[in-house]
Design a protein with these regions (language model features):
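Short glycine-rich anion-binding loops that position phosphate/pyrophosphate groups of nucleotides
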Residues: 11, 59-62, 92-95
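Structured adenosyl-cofactor binding patch, chiefly the S-adenosyl-L-methionine
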Residues: 99-142
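Conserved strand-to-helix beginnings and helix N-cap segments that scaffold or border functional pockets
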Residues: 16-20, 66-67, 101, 121
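Catalytic beta-strand/loop module used to bind and position nucleotide/cofactor moieties
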Residues: 68-99, 104-115
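N-terminal beta1-alpha1 ligand-phosphate binding loop
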Residues: 1-23
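Conserved RecA-like P-loop NTPase ATPase core
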Residues: 5, 55, 91, 124
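S-adenosyl-L-methionine/SAH cofactor-binding core of RNA-modifying enzymes
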Residues: 28-87
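Short hydrophobic segments within beta-strands
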Residues: 6-8, 36, 89
């Protein structure tokens, strides 16, 4: 499965860079992962691969459990995605435009908390890792 985490902005904080690097390494056995950094949302949209299945992290989105993220989203894409790249979009400090919200197959939220967009990209990678482990029945997730 090809997964792209597409983000507005660069990651500069060394502790977040280290966390991202760790999860990218952990995800290697589960998917082909790319992280795309765009200067702005126009760049994010322009870089979407043809035929990509877009999921956007947005404060207006649905809060999913890790099980639902794994089975309903990752599992569904593995079985029915037809090999299309799966893109998880993270907006900048102001979130996503209506264009991205309309284009997305689903809006996903980490709840009603305000979370720095730089940290969200690490959280997305962690949930991808957890989701793939859940799908394979590997230990690590606790309900």
């Amino acid at each position: 499965m090809k997964v792209v985490v597409s983000v507005v902005g660069r990651l500069k904080e060394p502790y977040l860079v280290a966390a991202e690097d760790e999860y990218r390494k952990r995800l290697r056995p589960y998917c082909t992962l790319a992280v795309h950094e765009a200067k702005d949302e126009a760049g994010l949209v322009a870089a979407l691969p043809d035929g990509a299945h877009l999921y956007a992290f947005d404060e207006r989105g649905e809060a999913l459990t890790s099980q639902a993220f794994a089975h309903d989203l990752l599992g569904h894409e593995q079985q029915h995605g037809g090999g299309a790249p799966v893109v998880f979009a993270i907006g900048g400090a102001d979130g996503h435009s209506d264009l991205v919200r309309r284009r997305a197959r689903k809006l996903i939220s980490f709840g009603r908390l305000t979370i720095a967009h730089r940290l969200v990209r690490v959280l997305v990678l962690e949930q991808l890792y957890r989701g793939f482990k859940i799908l394979r029945g590997e230990p690590s997730h606790r309900d």
